[in-house]
Amino acid sequence: MAAESSNPRTVEEIFKDFSGRRSGFLRALSVDVDKFYSLCDPEMENLCLYGHPNGTWEVNLPAEEVPPELPEPALGINFARDGMQRKDWLSLVAVHSDCWLLSVSSYFGARLNRNERKRLFSLINDLPTLFEVVTGRKPIKDGKPSMDLGSKSRNGVKRSIEGQTKSTPKLMEESYEDEDDEHGDTLCGSCGGNYTNDEFWICCDVCERWYHGKCVKITPAKAESIKQYKCPSCCTKKGRQ
């Protein structure tokens, strides 16, 4: 069995597919690592590690059809297993798996427009790579390292742990110059536009995506009175459940 195929079309669907496959890889390289290691017998033929959209993983031979329906992962990951230290081999597999995840997402995203591709890459880039997780450079549960923990809007409103809001304009003004550099690659989850410090932004407490206030019809004054902000997409998902 080769890579399980789905047919995601939208940014959200492609990111969901990416996240599912990534979860499968993470499981193979952490929780199920002993099983994965034993399956990669160097005496076997060219083996590949597949991550599936449902969060499962599989070690198998590559697809027989040429060209394959999806881009293929690295061939022969089993051959190098006994010639390297275990941690180095797992790191190598992680790097190749990162490359495959990006290639599959690029394949599905071929028909997206420029802003949609930027949104998709921004969502993907918010997650630590498999290599970072395997080597311990970043934990599996990773927020944006450049954002203040608990900060939900960029106009100087910071949420405290108790859910209350307090204005910190001086702190934000002092950090605007650095913030431009840190958040320059952040994209609005609605329009796909880049972050600039002269606009009001707000972050969804559920999916943690950032939005222009004008795109989701939230003003700085209204943000002050919101204890937990949910973006339109998360509100819609909850309504369907």
Curated annotation (Swiss-Prot):
GO biological process: chromatin organization; regulation of DNA-templated transcription
Keywords: Acetylation, Chromatin regulator, Metal-binding, Nucleus, Transcription, Transcription regulation, Zinc, Zinc-finger
Gene Ontology CC: one annotated term: nucleus
Keyword Zinc-finger: yes
InterPro entries in the record: Alfin, Alfin_N, PHD_AL_plant, Zinc_finger_PHD-type_CS, Znf_FYVE_PHD, Znf_PHD, Znf_PHD-finger, Znf_RING/FYVE/PHD
Zinc-finger ranges (PHD-type): 185-237
Subunit structure: Interacts with H3K4me3 and to a lesser extent with H3K4me2.
Role according to the record: Histone-binding component that specifically recognizes H3 tails trimethylated on 'Lys-4' (H3K4me3), which mark transcription start sites of virtually all active genes.
Notes concerning its domains: The PHD-type zinc finger mediates the binding to H3K4me3.
Protein name: PHD finger protein ALFIN-LIKE 1
Gene name for this UniProt entry: AL1
